[in-house]
A protein has these predicted regions:
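Structural motif
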Residues: 133-136, 157-160, 200-203
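A charged, amphipathic alpha-helical module
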Residues: 57-140, 147, 152-154, 250-267
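Short, small-residue-biased leader/transition segments that mark boundaries at the very start
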Residues: 2-7
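Short connector loops at secondary-structure junctions
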Residues: 161-179
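Phosphate/diphosphate-binding loops
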Residues: 179-214, 219-220
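Solvent-exposed alpha-helices and their adjacent loops that cap or buttress functional pockets
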Residues: 19-23, 36-39, 43-46, 102, ...
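Short helix/loop capping segments that flank catalytic or ligand/cofactor-binding pockets
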Residues: 144-147, 168-171, 211-215
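Active-site cores of enzymes that catalyze phosphoryl transfer or operate on phosphate-rich substrates
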Residues: 206-267
Length: 267
């Protein structure tokens, strides 16, 4: 039943938390947030959703060797407020602080990205998928993309970004790879229809994955902080051999496939 699936997933999350959490903490019952008054619920939701996005950027910066003590400490400040603060004025102040620290975190990630991959430049990105084996990379972890580009170089496999990975084409140290060919499809919200019967593997590097449909489930791989039940996960060794093997097995399209972007264009 749906209820049993929810309880099973909650148990899996608790087990994962025990594995990765370095301190003993009690779980917060999120239903408490939704039971609060409209104003308190809205303010706390803004804070919660703000730090969720910030956590992803902070993680990517950390992978590239960049950290910020103010950003890190704010996670604790925000979570404590979500758990126990009930003063709307204090929460509003914290909402504004969330935006401020988010901006600081984005600057941190920008610094990490540009130091490793160069300053991005305006780039025309093709939306045509060339015939032959290819891999689609979704999410926004540039480090994972770089490692995949290195491992696929010279193997006759083209690489296409998807959704949030699109900006990768502007970075000199990534665009220098000739087999980084273009972008596949439109936004992450359309992935279930656009990936239908795709003759290639998809690698998800962050949590933009949607419930995977049977028409492409055998071609989906995850890595880093994203995973999905019954899918192959590429671990910390970052050995993308299973993804590469799947790309060669699938073979790609027999002829070039022209796709359109969000604005209806072809680049």
């Amino acid at each position: 039943s749906a209820a049993s699936d929810v309880y099973k997933r909650q148990a899996e999350v608790e087990e994962e938390k025990r594995k990765i959490c370095k301190s003993k903490v009690d779980s917060y019952d999120l239903s408490r947030l939704w039971e609060a008054s409209d104003d308190i619920r809205s303010l706390k939701s803004l804070i919660l959703f703000g730090i969720k996005g910030m956590a992803a950027y902070a993680y990517h910066a950390l992978v590239l060797g960049k950290t910020d003590s103010e950003v890190n400490s704010f996670f604790y400040t925000a979570l404590r407020a979500i758990e126990g603060e009930s003063d709307p004025d204090k929460l509003l102040s914290l909402v504004l602080k969330t935006g401020e620290v988010n901006f600081r975190c984005m600057a941190l990630l920008d610094s990490a990205n540009t130091e490793n991959y160069g300053n991005p430049v305006p780039t025309v990105v093709p939306l045509t998928i060339e015939k032959g084996p290819f891999i689609v990379v979704s999410g926004h972890d540039l480090h994972d993309l770089k490692l995949l580009l290195e491992q696929t170089e010279g193997k006759g496999i083209n690489i296409y970004t998807h959704s949030e990975m699109l900006p990768a084409h502007g970075y000199p140290e990534l665009k220098k790879y000739k087999h980084l060919k273009g972008n596949f499809g439109t936004g992450w919200q359309n992935q279930q229809s656009e990936f239908h019967n795709i003759p290639a593997p998809i690698l998800f590097t962050t949590n933009c994955i949607m419930p995977v449909r049977q028409s492409y489930s055998d071609r989906v791989f995850t890595t880093s902080v994203v995973s999905y039940p019954e899918l192959v996960h590429i671990g910390d060794d970052k050995d993308f051999s299973p993804v590469i093997a799947k790309a060669l097995e699938c073979g790609g399209y027999d002829e070039d496939k022209e796709m359109t972007g969000m604005n209806g264009g072809h680049t």
